[in-house]
């Protein structure tokens, strides 16, 4: 039979029947930490994982019942645990005007589970789900709008900053966490007063006590930056990490995932990759390419950090990104210290978006092969992704 999937705190009861005389019956194996109650008199079997994860418990095992040293019943069971190394999350943003975001989960047996957060917590995460991060036995979620959409519609969301137990998905923290930036277009931008609401967009957790959140401002994303969140109090700082705040897609933090690797955080900023030291919360290195935009970063299977830059371009990219390219797009590889180890031009057919409406190209990397995946077209509505081999330079067009 196929393995039986069970949720933490659930139970399955079975009525047992025998097709003939069985002289002796005994249970010879059961998952460690689970309840496995075999009642011969009542001819019943009850299987239940614990309500919470406990150290040393089996996530999956086999219940075996035998007679005269011969198995007469054997069934595999597993608990739906969201930390399994072979599980995969798919984050669905939702729509800012009509519905909240959600997540789906493919478990280690490639079974598809919908609305795992909603079923466990009896509510939705929030409006415009942006990012999630697993660390310290927890899952951290970021939503852009929280309980209220940018159109003012109230949804049944838990907030803009939500923390769950990584094993069970049970909600631990739910905060709407509004924060603001002061935008003065005549003199530049500071972060001293409550003037413009900020939209949290990406998170990286650097320790059990601290995380960084990248955000952009709610005035059509004119500015962006990175701030510190205290994970003990779940309060976000009122000022930015120096060197991360500026004009969106030009001098401010890129609306893209940050990478935490070997004690450092790698992030995009305008035309640069910046390296932050969580010990000092300071930018300790900047790698800049003039007249380009950094679009995304990802950590390759070889341990290097890969950044993808647009080609060199002229003109104001504006919201839709009508740029004229003079040099091709480029992949830059950096080592653990942020030193450039290679610069590789991409084929000239690859023209990456430059407008503020398309700040990233959704790049990710394979954990096991030298492949990067990203959108290589300027079309705002493009839905194809290509695969790039950073060892051979080979491109598989429209791979996804």
Model region roles, listed by residue range:
Residues 72-82:
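C-terminal edge beta-strand
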Residues 107-110, 165-169, 230-234, 277-281, ...:
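Short loop/turn segments that connect beta-strands within beta-propeller blades
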Residues 22-37:
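Short, solvent-exposed loop/linker segments at beta-strand-coil boundaries, enriched for Pro/Gly
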Residues 97-104, 149-162, 220-228, 271-277, ...:
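Structural motif
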Residues 124-133, 181-204, 243-262, 291-302, ...:
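Repeated scaffold domains used in trafficking and secretory/extracellular systems
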Residues 354-400:
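Loop/turn-rich, solvent-exposed surfaces of beta-rich toroidal or solenoidal domains
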Residues 40, 46-55, 94-199:
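Post-signal peptide N-terminal segment of secreted/secretory-pathway proteins
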């Amino acid at each position: 039979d196929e393995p039986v999937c069970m949720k933490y705190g659930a139970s399955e009861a079975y009525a047992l029947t025998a097709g003939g005389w069985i002289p002796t019956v005994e249970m010879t194996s059961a998952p460690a930490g689970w309840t496995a109650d075999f009642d011969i008199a009542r001819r019943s079997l009850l299987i239940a994982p614990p309500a919470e994860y406990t150290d040393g418990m089996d996530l999956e095992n086999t219940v075996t019942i035998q007679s005269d040293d011969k198995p007469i019943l054997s069934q595999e069971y597993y608990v739906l645990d969201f930390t399994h190394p072979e599980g995969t999350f798919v984050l669905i943003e939702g729509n800012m005007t009509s519905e909240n975001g959600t997540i789906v989960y493919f478990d280690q047996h490639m079974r598809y589970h919908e609305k795992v957060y909603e079923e466990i917590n009896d509510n939705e995460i929030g409006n415009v789900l942006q990012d999630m991060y697993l660390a310290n036995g927890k899952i951290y979620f970021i939503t852009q709008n929280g309980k209220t959409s940018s159109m003012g519609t109230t949804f049944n969301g838990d907030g803009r900053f939500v923390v769950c137990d990584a094993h069970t998905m049970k909600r631990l923290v739910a905060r709407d966490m509004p924060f603001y930036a002061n935008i003065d277009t005549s003199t530049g931008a500071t972060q001293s007063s409550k003037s413009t609401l900020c939209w949290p967009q990406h998170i990286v957790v650097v320790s059990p006590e601290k995380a960084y959140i990248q955000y952009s401002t709610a005035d059509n994303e004119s500015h962006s930056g990175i701030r510190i969140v205290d994970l003990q109090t779940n309060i976000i700082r009122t000022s930015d990490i120096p060197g991360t705040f500026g004009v969106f897609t030009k001098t401010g933090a890129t609306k893209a995932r940050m990478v935490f690797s070997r004690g450092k955080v790698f992030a995009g900023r305008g035309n640069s990759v910046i390296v932050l030291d969580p010990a000092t919360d300071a930018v300790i290195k900047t790698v800049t390419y003039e007249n380009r935009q950094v679009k995304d970063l990802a950590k390759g299977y070889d341990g290097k950090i890969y950044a993808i830059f647009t080609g060199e371009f002229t003109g104001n990219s504006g919201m839709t990104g009508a740029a004229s390219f003079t040099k091709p797009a480029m992949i830059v590889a950096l080592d653990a210290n942020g030193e450039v180890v290679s610069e590789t031009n991409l084929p000239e057919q690859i023209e990456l978006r430059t407008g503020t409406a398309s700040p990233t190209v959704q790049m990710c990397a394979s954990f096991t092969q030298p492949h990067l995946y990203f959108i290589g077209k300027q079309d705002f509505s493009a839905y194809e992704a290509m695969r790039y081999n950073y060892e051979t330079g080979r491109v598989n067009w429209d791979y996804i």
